[in-house]
From Swiss-Prot:
GO CC aspect terms: nucleus
Species this protein is from: Oryza sativa subsp. japonica
Alphabetically ordered keywords of this record: DNA-binding, Nucleus, Transcription, Transcription regulation
Classification via SUPFAM superfamilies: DNA-binding pseudobarrel domain
Region (Disordered), start-end ranges: 45-68, 233-279
Lineage: Eukaryota, Viridiplantae, Streptophyta, Embryophyta, Tracheophyta
Protein name, UniProt field: B3 domain-containing protein Os05g0481400
Pfam families: B3 (PF02362)
């Protein structure tokens, strides 16, 4: 019991000493004016918090019957019609006194040349190539549908391009047999003609199976000779020419037989004149 009473007395003495120390500290703070400063700071903080502007509420947009558009410009009607006037005027230009005009587009006829017609056109193109100046590089190209319709892209022989054309993009002039000039764009890294080839193909009605001879007349100029695979005028005239040749051969053989026979009668008319010409 005595021990407990002693511990209680010690605790009470400690609390009394602590209370005195707190009072002395408060008095010391009052002497320094720190207590008043802390109160003024608390009041200023409360005043600033109360006067802070409250955030404005967001406006609620009402969705109407009209379509919502992000762009502020006026809506224009959509047109799916392509305009090639400026492109065609760039593609085709005529030299000298020739008429300057733009060629309108044509629908693909769908006509496909047979294998024999393609081979005949290719061989004629090779013969024409052999008659050109050997100093000018040249090659023969047979047209397929992608060259003359749809994409209008003409790939050139890779070996020819590496030997005679620079590996960059630049303008080239396509000149036909009549001297007509068409501006085109050669793409070196793809070894082909793109811009301008469309106008040349449409102007000359190129079709699948046609053979073209490309002669590099100048570093930036191709002279192009066209051999049509399906030529209606030529096809109509061929049978007549063959018949005339056959009649001529028959008449010549008859004249020779009559001349060789011992009892041959004197020739009259046309056969006599033909035989006299041969002698």
């Amino acid at each position: 019991m005595a021990a407990e009473a002693g511990s209680a007395a010690a605790g009470a003495a400690y609390e009394e000493e602590r209370r005195k120390r707190v009072l002395e500290n408060l008095k010391h703070l009052e002497d320094l004016g720190i207590k008043k400063m802390s109160k003024s700071l608390l009041e200023a903080a409360r005043l600033q918090k109360s006067t802070r502007a409250s955030p404005k509420p967001r406006k609620k947009f009402e969705v109407g019957a009209t379509e919502v558009r992000r762009s502020s410009r006026a809506r224009n009607s959509v047109s799916y019609k392509e305009n090639f006037d400026e492109l065609n005027s760039f593609l085709c230009r005529r030299r000298g006194s020739r008429i300057r005009s733009t060629e309108q587009g044509r629908d693909y006829t769908g006509r496909v040349a047979s294998y024999e017609q393609q081979q005949r056109a290719f061989k004629k193109a090779e013969r024409l190539q052999n008659s050109l100046d050997p100093e000018n590089p040249s090659f023969v190209k047979t047209m397929v549908r992608s060259h003359v319709s749809s994409c209008f892209w003409l790939g050139l022989p890779t070996r020819f391009c590496k030997l005679h054309l620079p590996p960059k993009e630049y303008k080239m002039v396509l000149e036909d047999e009549e001297g007509g000039e068409f501006d085109s764009v050669y793409i070196g890294n793809r070894t082909g003609l793109s811009g301008g080839w469309r106008g040349f193909a449409m102007h000359h009605n190129l079709e699948d199976g046609d053979s073209l001879v490309f002669e590099l007349a100048e570093p930036d100029r191709f002279k192009i000779y066209i051999i049509k695979a399906v030529d209606e005028d030529a096809n109509e005239s061929e049978p007549a020419d063959e018949e005339a040749i056959g009649d001529k051969d028959t008449s010549t053989e008859d004249a020779a037989e009559q001349d060789d026979s011992p009892n041959a009668e004197p020739l009259k008319g046309t056969k006599r004149r033909k035989l006299r010409g041969r002698r």
